[in-house]
Amino acid sequence: METFSLLEIFKAVILGIVQGITEWLPVSSTGHMILVDEFIKLNFSNTFISTFLVVIQFGSILAVLVIFFRKLNPFDSAKNIKQKKETVRLWLKVIIAVIPSGVIGILFEDDIDRLFFNSTVVAIALIVYGIIMIGLEKRNKRPKYKDFSQVTYKLALCIGLFQCLALIPGTSRSGSTIIGAVLLGTSRYVAAEFSFFLAIPTMLGASALKLLKAGFGFTGFEWLILGVGSVVAFVVSIVVIKFFMDYIKKHDFKVFGYYRIVLGIVVLAYFFLL
């Protein structure tokens, strides 16, 4: 599509909002995108739509970098040598953690999409991980790791293995890493932080890979749509991340577990009963 359309821009805004909200909450952005896509379909080729849904994640990633810039910046002049070394170790932990899902994603992305990218799998994953999330909170176990600096390289790798589960649509990237981190003994806050940091290389890699596969031969209007979606995702992500980090200081994840179960039932009902 090459003509300018306010309707398509409006759709890009809505999709950017959905992306910005659901990427950072453990509720599955894919599950929401499937539902939204039923009602708000971009009037472009399937190839471009697929690229759009991945590339707008750039906006979400930028939000993480802005919010946690000081913590993630090893060159911050306000940090002493010890703090700078700790920041370097933080990045090493993130790199170690992202290797498993990165390797599996590169090798089997097309196979996983072909086998699992459907409403049934998404709905089941929403419900199953919702139940796990509720059960996890009912354990009421005291966290062993209450600060990110306490996370070891071995623990980082183990959390990274949990992120591999997110390759199955409906699982939720943030949900799988948060569940894994809490199961392994981190506090909710550390689990959420690590999930956000892991998103940087994970989503950057996925977006870059998608762009390389699709090529860069988009029309001017298609580039505009990509830009609008990314900017909206960035702004919404800023708000959602700040809200979520404040929320988990005083609350647990059960509400997200119940929400996932309800959404999973809605997806099943919509696609099989309506």
Swiss-Prot record:
Subcellular location per the Swiss-Prot or TrEMBL entry: Cell membrane
Transmembrane segments annotated in the record for this chain: 7-27, 48-68, 88-108, 115-135, 151-171, 189-209, 221-241, 253-273
Membrane topology summary: Multi-pass membrane protein
Enzyme Commission identifier(s): 3.6.1.27
Family designation: Belongs to the UppP family.
Keywords: Antibiotic resistance, Cell membrane, Cell shape, Cell wall biogenesis/degradation, Hydrolase, Membrane, Peptidoglycan synthesis, Transmembrane, Transmembrane helix
Listed GO CC annotations: plasma membrane
Note: Bacitracin is thought to be involved in the inhibition of peptidoglycan synthesis by sequestering undecaprenyl diphosphate, thereby reducing the pool of lipid carrier available.
Keyword Transmembrane helix: yes
InterPro entries linked to this entry: UppP
Protein name as catalogued: Undecaprenyl-diphosphatase 1
NCBIfam families in UniProt: PRK00281.1-2, PRK00281.1-4, PRK00281.1-5, undec_PP_bacA
Record gene name: uppP1
UniProt superkingdom: Bacteria
GO molecular function, one term: undecaprenyl-diphosphatase activity
A GO biological process held by the record: regulation of cell shape
Reactions mediated catalytically: di-trans,octa-cis-undecaprenyl diphosphate + H2O = di-trans,octa-cis-undecaprenyl phosphate + phosphate + H(+)
UniProt main location, coarse: membrane
Functional description taken from the UniProt entry: Catalyzes the dephosphorylation of undecaprenyl diphosphate (UPP). Confers resistance to bacitracin.
